[in-house]
C-alpha cells in the first residue's frame, strides 16, 4: 500500500482509481440511503457527495443525510425504517416522495434534521469573490474586482497549526482575506472552489486553503462549525494533470482550479467569512522543511462560494 499510493509525487494513479467507488458503480441497482458528517476529516464528505450524485444520475432512488460532526453517526431510526420498509421489504409507504436531503443544522440534535429538496440546495448560486492585499496582516474578500496587479508571499512553516494561523492578525506563514462583518445570516450549500495563480521558490510546494468563520471562537466547548467552514488541498505540481505532475520552475506562476470539500453551513450574522491560503498543513499534508516561499497573484485568484440566494443574498449580508 505504501508503494502504491505514491506519497512522494501525490499523483493520481491506478492504485487510487482502483479504490474509487465511482469506477465500480455501473452494476449498482439498490436504492441508496447515504449518511455522512460534513466534518468527517477521515473519510471526507466529497466521497458521499460524489457517490450520491452519480446514483441520482443513474436513476437510482437516493436520499442523503448529513450532520455537522465527524466520522460516524447514522440517520434517525424513523428515517432508516421508512427507507428499508420501502426498498428492502417492498411495502409502499411514499418514502420516494420525501425530501431528498436531510441536513442537521449547526446547533440542532442530529436526530432532528431539516428537510431540503435536494443537496446542494437548489437555491444556491455561485458568488465570485476577489482578493484585496493585506499581508502579513489581513486583506479583503469582496465581490468587487479590485483589478490590482498585486502579489503577496507567505513562507511555508508546518510548525504553525492552521488554527494558530487563522487566529492571528499578523503572520508571514499564511495569507488571509476576509469579508465585511455579516449583517444577515448567510447559507453556503455545495462545493466552494478556488482558482489560484501562484509561484513557488522551490520545485514543489503544498497548497492548503481553508474557509473560516471569524473571529475565531476560542472557547474550549466551541463546535467545529463555529470556526471552520470547509477546507481544500492541492499539489501545484499537478496544475495541468492529476496523473502526471511536473517539477515547478522557481518563480514561474502556474494557474490551478480545485474544489473545497462540500459543505452546508449557515454562517451567523456578526461573523466574517475568511479565505486562508497557506502551504503545509500539519494535519493533512506531507511536511517539508520550512522555508519555501509561495507567492499568490491576487488579480488572477478568485474564490467561488455556492450561496443560497446568490449575489442578492451576499449583497444583503455583506455590502
Region locations from a protein language model:
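Residue-level signal for short, function-critical loop segments
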Residues: 38-40, 68, 279
Amino acid at each position: 500500500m505504501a508503494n502504491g499510493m505514491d506519497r512522494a509525487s501525490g499523483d493520481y494513479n491506478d492504485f487510487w482509481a482502483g479504490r474509487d467507488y465511482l469506477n465500480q458503480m455501473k452494476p449498482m441497482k439498490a436504492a441508496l440511503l447515504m449518511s455522512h458528517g460534513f466534518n468527517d476529516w477521515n473519510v471526507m464528505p466529497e466521497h458521499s457527495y460524489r457517490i450520491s450524485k452519480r446514483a441520482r444520475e443513474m436513476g437510482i432512488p437516493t436520499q442523503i443525510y448529513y450532520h455537522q460532526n465527524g466520522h460516524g453517526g447514522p440517520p434517525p431510526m424513523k428515517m432508516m425504517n421508512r427507507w428499508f420498509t420501502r426498498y428492502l421489504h417492498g411495502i409502499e409507504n411514499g418514502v420516494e416522495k420525501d425530501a431528498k436531503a436531510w441536513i442537521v443544522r449547526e446547533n440542532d440534535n442530529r436526530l432532528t434534521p431539516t428537510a431540503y429538496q435536494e443537496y446542494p440546495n437548489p437555491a444556491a448560486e455561485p458568488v465570485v469573490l476577489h482578493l484585496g492585499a493585506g499581508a502579513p496582516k489581513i486583506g479583503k474578500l469582496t465581490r468587487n474586482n479590485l483589478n490590482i496587479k498585486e502579489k503577496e508571499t507567505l513562507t511555508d512553516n508546518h510548525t504553525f497549526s492552521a488554527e494558530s494561523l487563522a487566529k492571528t492578525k499578523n503572520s508571514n506563514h499564511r495569507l488571509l482575506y476576509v469579508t465585511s462583518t455579516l449583517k444577515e445570516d448567510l447559507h453556503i450549500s455545495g462545493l466552494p472552489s478556488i482558482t489560484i495563480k501562484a509561484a513557488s521558490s522551490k520545485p514543489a510546494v503544498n497548497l492548503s486553503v481553508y474557509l473560516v468563520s471569524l473571529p475565531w471562537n476560542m472557547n474550549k466547548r466551541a463546535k467545529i462549525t463555529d470556526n471552520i467552514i470547509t477546507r481544500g488541498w492541492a499539489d501545484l505540481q499537478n496544475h495541468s494533470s492529476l496523473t502526471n505532475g511536473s517539477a515547478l520552475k522557481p518563480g514561474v506562476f502556474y494557474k490551478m482550479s480545485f474544489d473545497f470539500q462540500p459543505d452546508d453551513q449557515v454562517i451567523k450574522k456578526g461573523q466574517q467569512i475568511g479565505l486562508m491560503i497557506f502551504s503545509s498543513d500539519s494535519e493533512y499534508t506531507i511536511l517539508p522543511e520550512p522555508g519555501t516561499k509561495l507567492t499568490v497573484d491576487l488579480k488572477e485568484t478568485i474564490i467561488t462560494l455556492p450561496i443560497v440566494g446568490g449575489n442578492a443574498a451576499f449583497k444583503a449580508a455583506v455590502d
